[in-house]
Amino acid sequence: MKQLRLGIAAGAAALLGGCALYHPLPLAHGPDLAGRLAALRTEVPATRPGAPARRIATDSPLDIDDVGFLAVLNDPELRSEPGQADVAQASLLQSSLLPNPAASVSYGALLGGEGTTPAWAASLTEDLKSILTYHTRKKSARLQTQQVNADLLWQEWQIAQKARLLALDLYYGQQSLDLGRRELGLLDREVKEVQAATQAGNLDLSALAPLLTAKAAAEQAVASLGLTQMQNWQALDALLGLDPQVRFAIAAPALPPLPADLAPLLADLPDRRPDLVALQLGYRSADEDVRSAIIGQFPAFAVGGQWAQDNTDVRSGGPTATFDLPVFDRNQGQVRQTRATRLLLNEQYQSRLDDAFGTVKGLDAQIRRLSEDVRNASVAAAAAEKISASARRAYAQGNMDQRSLADFETTALDRRIEALALERSLGETQITLTVELGLGLPQTRIVPARKS
């Protein structure tokens, strides 16, 4: 009896040892924003087998690619990525488990009558239907886990893309803002000189009106640019997990090279872009669900054995089989639902694929047009700046008045601002094209693992 009690205790301890335990997970009580760039995560994991990890230097101007990496490493919205991956892995684990066998035990104590012994009965059964669908269920769960990973990678790409575009806009926006302030300074100086001349009676008051109009337009443009810069900085700080007041230097953008031929890149685009890969995996998972639903048409079937003893000490035992009679429910609804889901995913994938191909070709056409516009605008800006330099020399020699010089200088600044705007549009389009082609970003997730 003592050995029996020890055995029961050991078995109970073994069962409890394999059980999960509860641990509290308190919520945060305040923000977790970094107050400076150096406080961010800066180590980029290896993105290819055998490649070393690298650390982003935050003590020098950042290029737009590094800004994108910092956003992926530190974006508050991406902090839930490890949790989503853990949920998918847990679902896969659950689908990988076979159903537990069912056991039943009953005991009937002898209370009176002609019986000689207590009665008891025991049975053990296993659901065969769950075993039949085990392979398809596990494969579907594995594909769903891979789909989650591809979706999470696409989220990283979108965050990196948004950060790179913001960094590009901030760089060119600052260049335009500096030029706009220079133009405003020139106009302000010219307005003051004309005002002095009109007060002295050397110029008619009508000469002041166009200058005031130009100055008001320049003030509005500078104010609008300043507000846009502030909004872009706040958006970028939010992506980086920084306090909204943090500012840092952004290096001149090095734009990705344009592909010489789109055909080979479009040919394997479905295997390279994470969102298309995720849709393919989702479709394959839905296809396995269809197979599982078809197998589920067969009635539930459980087999096992039972053993019993009655009050007269007569013992019996033998196999058992329990099954449903598929008179009403033959899993028709589940089969129809899984087929409809598979068809929906098929159509969604085709729609996304068509959109991807159309977007790539459209962006390529825009780049060709913008490249020509940038060349023309750069030539015009250089010509205007050359004329402005000649005007300054003429003014220094006394061969030109202040008003004419200001006109030449503001025209040169306007031309350069127009060229910068076109360069920014070209850069945005080129960066967008690289992502649409599935290029320029890692093919593996780089979000840091969850802290234990």
Q: Model-derived features: where do they sit?
A:
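Transmembrane beta-barrel architecture of outer-membrane proteins
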Residues: 66, 119, 165, 210, ...
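A short glycine-centered flexible hinge/capping loop motif at secondary-structure junctions
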Residues: 198-202, 395-399, 436
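C-terminal hydrophobic structural anchor segments
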Residues: 370-399
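Periplasmic alpha-helical coiled-coil/stalk elements that build and connect Gram-negative outer-membrane
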Residues: 3, 134, 143, 150-268, ...
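Terminal intrinsically disordered/low-complexity segments used for targeting and assembly
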Residues: 2-70, 226-268, 432-452
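Small/polar, glycine/serine/threonine/aspartate-rich low-complexity segments that form flexible
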Residues: 50-60, 101-133, 137, 247-261, ...
